[in-house]
Amino acid sequence: MDQLGSGHRNVFRDEEPGLTGIGTEPEFAIGQRALLVQTAQGNILWDSISYLDDATIEAVRRLGGISAITISHPHFYSSMVEWARAFDAPVRLHAANRAFVQRPDAAIEYWEGDTLALNSEVTLIRCGGHFPGSTVLHWAAGAGGRGVLLTGDTIYVVSDRRYASFMFSYPNLIPLPGSAIRGIVSAIEPFAFDRLYGGWFERVIRQDAKQAVTRSAQRYIRAIQERPQNT
Protein backbone atom coordinates (compact mmCIF):
# COMPACT_ATOMS: atom_id res chain seq x y z
CA MET A 1 0.00 0.00 0.00
CA ASP A 2 2.86 2.40 0.82
CA GLN A 3 4.52 1.73 -2.53
CA LEU A 4 1.26 2.34 -4.35
CA GLY A 5 0.79 5.60 -2.48
CA SER A 6 4.10 7.02 -3.64
CA GLY A 7 2.76 7.72 -7.12
CA HIS A 8 -1.03 7.44 -6.89
CA ARG A 9 -3.98 9.24 -5.35
CA ASN A 10 -7.69 8.61 -5.17
CA VAL A 11 -10.20 10.95 -6.79
CA PHE A 12 -13.89 11.49 -6.04
CA ARG A 13 -16.48 12.34 -8.68
CA ASP A 14 -20.14 13.17 -8.16
CA GLU A 15 -22.02 10.87 -10.52
CA GLU A 16 -25.48 12.06 -9.50
CA PRO A 17 -27.17 13.07 -6.24
CA GLY A 18 -26.46 10.31 -3.73
CA LEU A 19 -23.82 8.54 -5.83
CA THR A 20 -20.07 9.20 -5.74
CA GLY A 21 -17.39 7.51 -7.82
CA ILE A 22 -14.01 6.73 -6.24
CA GLY A 23 -11.07 5.89 -8.49
CA THR A 24 -7.28 5.92 -8.53
CA GLU A 25 -5.03 8.17 -10.63
CA PRO A 26 -2.93 7.26 -12.51
CA GLU A 27 -4.96 4.15 -13.26
CA PHE A 28 -3.97 1.06 -11.29
CA ALA A 29 -4.74 -2.62 -11.99
CA ILE A 30 -7.54 -2.59 -14.58
CA GLY A 31 -8.62 0.95 -13.78
CA GLN A 32 -11.96 0.20 -12.16
CA ARG A 33 -13.67 2.62 -9.80
CA ALA A 34 -15.85 2.07 -6.77
CA LEU A 35 -19.23 3.71 -6.18
CA LEU A 36 -20.55 5.02 -2.87
CA VAL A 37 -24.35 4.84 -2.68
CA GLN A 38 -25.59 7.29 -0.06
CA THR A 39 -28.93 6.49 1.57
CA ALA A 40 -30.71 7.62 4.72
CA GLN A 41 -30.26 4.08 6.04
CA GLY A 42 -26.50 4.04 5.59
CA ASN A 43 -23.99 4.24 2.77
CA ILE A 44 -23.10 1.22 0.63
CA LEU A 45 -19.68 0.89 -1.02
CA TRP A 46 -20.11 -0.94 -4.31
CA ASP A 47 -16.96 -2.63 -5.62
CA SER A 48 -13.49 -1.90 -4.34
CA ILE A 49 -10.29 -0.25 -5.46
CA SER A 50 -6.85 -1.34 -4.33
CA TYR A 51 -5.52 1.91 -2.92
CA LEU A 52 -6.75 3.21 0.43
CA ASP A 53 -5.05 6.04 2.31
CA ASP A 54 -5.87 8.41 5.17
CA ALA A 55 -7.10 11.12 2.81
CA THR A 56 -9.56 8.70 1.23
CA ILE A 57 -10.80 7.49 4.61
CA GLU A 58 -11.40 11.06 5.75
CA ALA A 59 -13.17 12.00 2.52
CA VAL A 60 -15.49 9.00 2.77
CA ARG A 61 -16.24 9.80 6.40
CA ARG A 62 -17.27 13.32 5.38
CA LEU A 63 -19.75 11.71 3.00
CA GLY A 64 -21.25 9.69 5.85
CA GLY A 65 -18.94 6.69 6.09
CA ILE A 66 -19.77 3.15 5.01
CA SER A 67 -22.36 0.85 6.59
CA ALA A 68 -21.73 -2.10 4.26
CA ILE A 69 -19.44 -3.13 1.40
CA THR A 70 -20.50 -5.35 -1.45
CA ILE A 71 -18.53 -6.37 -4.52
CA SER A 72 -19.68 -7.51 -7.93
CA HIS A 73 -17.16 -10.31 -8.47
CA PRO A 74 -13.74 -11.62 -7.34
CA HIS A 75 -11.60 -9.50 -9.70
CA PHE A 76 -12.51 -6.50 -7.53
CA TYR A 77 -11.97 -8.10 -4.11
CA SER A 78 -8.43 -6.60 -3.92
CA SER A 79 -8.27 -4.52 -0.70
CA MET A 80 -11.79 -5.21 0.55
CA VAL A 81 -10.49 -6.31 3.96
CA GLU A 82 -8.61 -3.02 4.42
CA TRP A 83 -11.73 -1.06 3.51
CA ALA A 84 -13.83 -3.14 5.90
CA ARG A 85 -11.45 -2.60 8.79
CA ALA A 86 -11.08 1.13 8.13
CA PHE A 87 -14.85 1.67 8.34
CA ASP A 88 -15.83 -1.21 10.64
CA ALA A 89 -18.19 -2.37 7.91
CA PRO A 90 -19.22 -5.88 6.85
CA VAL A 91 -18.39 -7.15 3.37
CA ARG A 92 -21.36 -8.95 1.84
CA LEU A 93 -20.38 -11.46 -0.87
CA HIS A 94 -22.42 -14.11 -2.62
CA ALA A 95 -21.66 -17.58 -1.27
CA ALA A 96 -21.15 -18.96 -4.79
CA ASN A 97 -17.91 -16.95 -4.94
CA ARG A 98 -16.57 -18.15 -1.58
CA ALA A 99 -13.84 -20.29 -3.20
CA PHE A 100 -12.33 -17.19 -4.83
CA VAL A 101 -11.73 -15.33 -1.54
CA GLN A 102 -7.98 -15.39 -0.92
CA ARG A 103 -8.01 -13.55 2.42
CA PRO A 104 -10.71 -14.87 4.75
CA ASP A 105 -11.70 -12.33 7.39
CA ALA A 106 -14.33 -11.97 10.09
CA ALA A 107 -15.74 -8.95 8.25
CA ILE A 108 -16.84 -11.09 5.30
CA GLU A 109 -20.46 -12.26 5.38
CA TYR A 110 -21.80 -14.61 2.71
CA TRP A 111 -25.34 -14.51 1.42
CA GLU A 112 -27.25 -17.06 -0.61
CA GLY A 113 -30.19 -17.04 -2.95
CA ASP A 114 -31.12 -14.74 -5.82
CA THR A 115 -31.53 -11.38 -4.05
CA LEU A 116 -30.58 -9.64 -0.83
CA ALA A 117 -32.16 -6.38 0.36
CA LEU A 118 -29.52 -4.25 2.10
CA ASN A 119 -32.11 -1.61 2.97
CA SER A 120 -35.37 -0.30 1.54
CA GLU A 121 -33.55 1.34 -1.41
CA VAL A 122 -30.76 -1.11 -2.22
CA THR A 123 -31.01 -4.73 -3.38
CA LEU A 124 -28.29 -7.12 -4.51
CA ILE A 125 -29.15 -9.41 -7.42
CA ARG A 126 -27.21 -12.53 -8.26
CA CYS A 127 -26.85 -12.71 -12.05
CA GLY A 128 -24.05 -15.24 -12.48
CA GLY A 129 -22.33 -15.27 -15.83
CA HIS A 130 -18.86 -13.79 -15.39
CA PHE A 131 -18.54 -15.71 -12.09
CA PRO A 132 -21.02 -18.09 -10.42
CA GLY A 133 -21.90 -15.45 -7.83
CA SER A 134 -21.55 -12.35 -10.00
CA THR A 135 -23.83 -9.71 -8.54
CA VAL A 136 -25.35 -6.38 -9.55
CA LEU A 137 -26.82 -3.71 -7.28
CA HIS A 138 -30.23 -2.11 -7.78
CA TRP A 139 -30.73 1.34 -6.26
CA ALA A 140 -34.42 2.15 -6.45
CA ALA A 141 -34.07 5.85 -5.57
CA GLY A 142 -31.38 6.53 -8.16
CA ALA A 143 -31.86 8.54 -11.36
CA GLY A 144 -34.51 10.69 -9.72
CA GLY A 145 -36.52 7.66 -8.61
CA ARG A 146 -36.42 5.91 -12.00
CA GLY A 147 -33.90 3.39 -10.69
CA VAL A 148 -30.21 2.67 -11.19
CA LEU A 149 -28.30 -0.57 -11.75
CA LEU A 150 -24.62 -0.89 -10.78
CA THR A 151 -23.06 -3.78 -12.67
CA GLY A 152 -19.26 -3.94 -12.50
CA ASP A 153 -18.53 -5.92 -15.65
CA THR A 154 -21.28 -8.49 -15.23
CA ILE A 155 -23.01 -6.19 -17.71
CA TYR A 156 -20.24 -4.27 -19.47
CA VAL A 157 -21.01 -0.86 -20.97
CA VAL A 158 -19.38 -0.65 -24.40
CA SER A 159 -17.79 2.40 -25.99
CA ASP A 160 -20.88 3.88 -27.62
CA ARG A 161 -22.80 3.84 -24.29
CA ARG A 162 -25.90 2.62 -26.13
CA TYR A 163 -25.18 -1.07 -25.76
CA ALA A 164 -23.68 -3.46 -23.24
CA SER A 165 -21.86 -6.75 -23.57
CA PHE A 166 -21.14 -9.88 -21.55
CA MET A 167 -18.14 -12.19 -21.20
CA PHE A 168 -16.97 -15.23 -19.32
CA SER A 169 -13.37 -14.01 -19.64
CA TYR A 170 -12.58 -10.50 -20.84
CA PRO A 171 -8.76 -10.89 -21.07
CA ASN A 172 -9.12 -14.09 -23.09
CA LEU A 173 -12.21 -12.96 -25.04
CA ILE A 174 -14.19 -16.07 -24.09
CA PRO A 175 -17.91 -15.40 -24.56
CA LEU A 176 -20.78 -16.54 -22.39
CA PRO A 177 -23.34 -18.99 -23.79
CA GLY A 178 -26.80 -17.78 -24.65
CA SER A 179 -28.28 -19.53 -21.62
CA ALA A 180 -26.11 -17.43 -19.29
CA ILE A 181 -27.12 -14.21 -21.03
CA ARG A 182 -30.79 -15.13 -20.70
CA GLY A 183 -30.17 -15.83 -17.02
CA ILE A 184 -28.71 -12.36 -16.49
CA VAL A 185 -31.64 -10.67 -18.25
CA SER A 186 -34.13 -12.78 -16.30
CA ALA A 187 -32.49 -11.90 -12.97
CA ILE A 188 -32.82 -8.14 -13.49
CA GLU A 189 -36.24 -8.22 -15.19
CA PRO A 190 -38.29 -7.59 -11.99
CA PHE A 191 -36.36 -4.38 -11.25
CA ALA A 192 -37.04 -0.97 -12.79
CA PHE A 193 -34.00 1.06 -13.81
CA ASP A 194 -33.37 3.85 -16.29
CA ARG A 195 -29.61 4.27 -15.75
CA LEU A 196 -26.73 1.80 -15.58
CA TYR A 197 -23.23 2.33 -14.21
CA GLY A 198 -20.52 -0.09 -15.29
CA GLY A 199 -17.25 -0.64 -13.47
CA TRP A 200 -15.31 2.34 -14.86
CA PHE A 201 -15.68 6.10 -15.00
CA GLU A 202 -17.66 7.16 -18.08
CA ARG A 203 -19.00 3.63 -18.67
CA VAL A 204 -22.56 4.74 -18.06
CA ILE A 205 -25.83 4.29 -19.95
CA ARG A 206 -27.61 7.48 -18.92
CA GLN A 207 -31.17 6.66 -19.97
CA ASP A 208 -33.31 3.79 -21.21
CA ALA A 209 -30.74 1.42 -19.73
CA LYS A 210 -33.09 -1.50 -19.21
CA GLN A 211 -34.09 -1.45 -22.86
CA ALA A 212 -30.41 -1.15 -23.81
CA VAL A 213 -29.54 -4.29 -21.85
CA THR A 214 -32.42 -6.22 -23.44
CA ARG A 215 -31.48 -5.31 -27.00
CA SER A 216 -27.79 -5.91 -26.22
CA ALA A 217 -28.57 -9.40 -24.99
CA GLN A 218 -30.63 -10.12 -28.09
CA ARG A 219 -27.82 -8.89 -30.35
CA TYR A 220 -25.23 -10.92 -28.45
CA ILE A 221 -27.24 -14.14 -28.64
CA ARG A 222 -27.82 -13.69 -32.36
CA ALA A 223 -24.11 -13.17 -32.91
CA ILE A 224 -23.03 -16.34 -31.11
CA GLN A 225 -25.77 -18.54 -32.54
CA GLU A 226 -25.93 -17.50 -36.17
CA ARG A 227 -23.41 -18.74 -38.69
CA PRO A 228 -21.23 -15.80 -39.82
CA GLN A 229 -21.52 -14.76 -43.45
CA ASN A 230 -18.51 -15.12 -45.73
CA THR A 231 -16.85 -11.81 -46.53
Describe each region flagged by the PLM:
Residues 74, 96, 201:
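Short, ordered loop/turn segments at secondary-structure junctions
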Residues 1-41, 211, 230-231:
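Zn-dependent metallo-beta-lactamase
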Residues 13-16, 37-40, 61-64, 143, ...:
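Flexible, charged surface loops at secondary-structure boundaries
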Residues 25-32, 95-96, 101-106, 112-114, ...:
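Active-site-proximal loop/helix segment associated with metal-binding centers of metalloenzymes
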